[in-house]
């Protein structure tokens, strides 16, 4: 019986394998030039190593637009004078400035090629600023379908979030959109209406209230980060912070409630959104200690 079962399984496997091979032969994957520009380490990418980003943007819930700039600091690895920056349609780059000079550029689909004024010398550290804006792609079924979510909470306040692991971060901000080169640190400055809060990556450095009634939240990431990991989460959030007794001393950690405020009393009630957080950190610290032994 066992022998017959094995023979039957083998026959089914061979049959399915042949069918699958036939399907592959009939529908070969065709890569476009855009696929190659997006997925490969092009000449316009390989000559520079990204060191730092300052993403400085205004998010407007009224018209679903994002406008602002990204300052890119980079180290020259090879001599070259043309840079690839990725930004997906329908967003546009308005201008690129380096050392006070407006640079020329041309667009090829979701890729911008920036013409630098002179050959970049190896080991030099330079920077330029890309100004951009428009209405980014709307996420239809996040996080599986990437883009920006523009919704409202139960109180009618805007609820906005980015999701881009599949599509890439260039769906909402200009960058070197390839995972082989992670930026080493980053400042994320997000301007929002005064009644809202933006939660991004890293540590909150400051909140600046402006005369027009808006607020800018400045978040700093001090460690390498993938482009697609950079995010905005904008809504009517309540913040809190706690001290955690770590293996090597106290750690301060904070979070943002995922529910709307409702009232100031919620801070006193604590809706337990982060129940289990300390236990998670306990586990991670224990794993790290085991790894270092």
Language model feature labels by segment:
Residues 42, 131-186, 235-243:
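Glycine/proline-rich low-complexity spacer/linker segments in large multi-domain proteins
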